Amino acid sequence: MSSPVITKIEITQYRIPYKDTATTGIGIYYEPGSSTGGPKLLGIQIMTNEGIAGEYISIAPGTLPQIDAIAPALIGKNPLEREWFYDTAKVVLRKQDKMGIGPMDIALWDFAGKYYQEPIYRLLGGHRKKLPAYASTLHGDKSKGGLSSPEEFADFAEQCMELGYKGFKIHGWDDGDVEREISIINEVGSRVGDKMDLMTDPCCIFNTYADALKVGRACDDQNFFWYEDPMKDGGVSFFIYRKLRQAIKTPILQGEHLHLVEPHVDMAIAEATDFFRADPEYDGGITGTMKIAHAAEGFGMDVELHIAGPAQRHCMAAMRNSNFYEMGLVHPKVPNPASPSEIYLGEYSDQLEAIGKDGCVDVPEGPGLGVEYNWKGIKKYAIAEFTYD
């Protein structure tokens, strides 16, 4: 039996406009009437001599130059040899952040699932069918009825709890106002803290350790589940996060901006975090994410996956040491722009209401990623197309 071979790779660069939302470049927030251009994203199709395509629609911006560097190496190769691709791409992209590996690896896993007629989670040995979810908000805004005040954040937390969510994560305003951040933590904590797990992610906005410490102590007062990426170092200074861990009792979650398994391991050895963050798009695909999960397991640590998507669901289904699926970014007034409905056909959804009363989301059961992409819709928003053969 001959091995499958990659014959062609097609990349579609597209941009779906944000409706009633805007961005500062740090975060996305609700702004009625606004229609700003979303980030330039990629649709990937890896064609083979088997007549089976590995597909993935990426939501991570800025990866095209890296994919352009690594895609030609895949032509003529066996798409099942994902470890070869992972190791080769790491070397090719050794001077970059390596975020181009993830989308391509996910497409290769999609091919493998279709080739073997199995969902990816089953190829990974996964068994979890129901994934507990938390609601992860858009950033704070200035529009009444949105998330314009601590009270509105707390109102939304109550709405999410009624929908079934087990946890709620705050993305506050992105201006670094410490007192306002603390006021959200206190309001949400006093309203739902005894009924939901609570988290906050300032998105690296605080200028000083002192600011991060003040907010961390507010998290302590409200018994928050974790405190994520507070400082403008971008979450990469192991020394200062070890100091922060020593100063507060709320667990620290770090790793979104490190990329791949090696710095995650270094961070654990430095005692700079309590939870790992991993993302199939950022961390070398499903291959790289599972390396992080297994490394964390060796340390007795948990891994929380970043943002929503089918690749995240398959990884989490194969991970013992993961607590929550991040349903983000959600808001009481607008759809989730981080996993837009326009890219899918069929029933798959990462919108606010796409959760069971048990507080869980399902793992796709179809071959590969188990989702059907709306390629016609993606082509509608296409900016450019690239072919490698």
Feature annotation, model-predicted:
Residues 130-248:
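Metal-dependent enolase-superfamily TIM-barrel catalytic cores that perform enediolate-based chemistry
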Residues 6, 51, 70, 104, ...:
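Conserved, mostly hydrophobic/aromatic
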Residues 8, 47-116:
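Metal- or metallocofactor-binding catalytic centers and their adjacent structured scaffolds
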Residues 40, 49-53, 115-118, 123, ...:
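Ligand-binding pocket scaffold of soluble enzyme catalytic domains
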Residues 105-145:
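Glycine-rich, aromatic-flanked loop segments that form ligand/cofactor-binding clefts
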Residues 1-53, 61, 102, 158:
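Non-catalytic terminal accessory/regulatory regions of metabolic enzymes
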Residues 4-7, 11-14, 18-21, 33-39, ...:
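Flexible C-terminal active-site loop/helix
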